[in-house]
Amino acid sequence: MSRTRYDWSKLCHDILRLILESLHYKDYHRARTVCSNWYTASTTCKRPLYPWRIKFNKISTSLFDPREDKIHEIQHPGIEFSDRNVLASCSNWFLMVDSGLEFYLLNAFTRERINLPSMESSILGKERLEKEVAWKHFIERTDIISTKKQACLWINERTGDYVVAWSIKQHYLFTYKKGDDSWLNLEGTKCVSMALNKDYKLYVYALDNSIKIFDLYGEFPSEIVEENPYRNHPFSFRFVSKPEEHAWKQVVAITNSGEVLMIVSLKGLEDKRLFYIYKMDFGSCNWERVDSLGGEMLIFGHGVTIRAPILDINGLGIKSDSICFRGDDLWPLSQLFIPITQPMCGVFDLATSTITWPKSLDASVLKSFWFVPGHA
């Protein structure tokens, strides 16, 4: 007698939702990648979004869930993280690069890997031709992990579509999306900071203080000019700051409603290290400081705000109207203006202008990052 065979991918969403909501967080993120039906069902699950921390060890990762106060260890056989650097993240995915400019995407939970085209022919061949120097003298390994680079990533985990943007030394800005033959160069755009949203729109804060918007959806990137309300209204911190305030880093960010924000890491009175938020008043076209993120929260440098838990998670400062950051995002303590490596990630409370330092996962800030599982 033959046994009845069931197609688990076709379970009704009500049953799938019950199954998914009963799973541990790590298993939940693996299960939602089984098929498109399971992923769609997972989007209806009532699981809160909040930042985790990840530490890249030699051949493994440590994922810290602040709500459960638990660390999950995941082995990555065949990957040597000491030779690789994290450039950006989106949901469960990280944009990685090695010293040879080989790029790939890595899923923190499933260990799935997506290889991207090498950047060497795009950057380094051009540089050899123009300056007749070996590529290693143009891009050193330290440049890849320094503040001279910017990158962002967006990925649709249901369809597998993704888009990546990467800039180095404020000189080159490249984009690549699934289906492209190679990296594309947005020539003439000197990028200080950038943000990428689900509509394939790339927001670039440029060296001349202007904010440019590029549409990456078509065959080739195109700049949006007429419909860019920020194009002729540059943001300059020195025009909105007080004499005792000095900027360390400035990044652009996009809210869930589509508003553009400028986030500034700075040193204030008595050397207090702060974060300020600015948005443009469309009536006056002036940039004005605001005191909150409208109940959302932000990981500094990630480019997009996220829905946030209203109440503090386990006293770690993770809540609405807070900014998660890494130690090198803060104004450096050194009088020599050299960033001092902080041994941990922190959280800045916009309401009180105070910093909470969660317990450290490791002494190496260069291998420890914030990310938001399930947020894309």
UniProtKB/Swiss-Prot annotation:
CDD domains: F-box_SF. Pfam families: Beta-prop_KIB1-4, F-box. Residues 6-53 form the F-box domain. This is Putative F-box protein At2g33200.
